[in-house]
């Protein structure tokens, strides 16, 4: 039987800067290091793969939407020489108010809907897709925990496996629900 540190070395676990990633890595390393599964390793790897896939999708979509917002802000804040000359000429003209209204509505599309509404609709769609993925993940985890309960074990090992599986499932789902709602 290997110690906790030997298992950490065998798994080559890298902990990144992200707070949620560190929590998930800790939970799965703790889960893998404290269980004595032999045939259930494939199930654990499947759970890890599904959860990491969802987490990577969540982080990449979050960073992608943040990148979109930043690029939109940067593109809207860049003033070219032509814009500067137009701005100076409009100060001298009598329709200064009209120019400021045009600048105020610069972020709108021709239909009059601001771009942030498009991003908001996209984020709502992403959250709905994540909710569906989380529901599928919960069904898969329920099925895997049912299969683990069905495997013949001694009473102590059964209770240990059941406790660890249920606690890791509950904590993982709560983390995803927290990230989904925030």
UniProtKB/Swiss-Prot annotation:
Cellular location(s): Cell membrane
Glycan-modified residues: 88, 120
UniProt keyword terms in alphabetical order: Cell membrane, Glycoprotein, Lipoprotein, Membrane, Palmitate, Signal, Transmembrane, Transmembrane helix
Lipid bilayer topology: Single-pass membrane protein; Lipid-anchor
Assigned GO CC terms: plasma membrane
Signal peptide: 1-35
Keyword Transmembrane recorded: yes
Top-level division of the source organism's lineage: Eukaryota
S-palmitoyl cysteine lipid attachment residues: 168
Membrane-spanning intervals of the chain: 162-180
Biological function: Major antigen in the surface tegument.
Protein name per Swiss-Prot or TrEMBL: Antigenic integral membrane glycoprotein
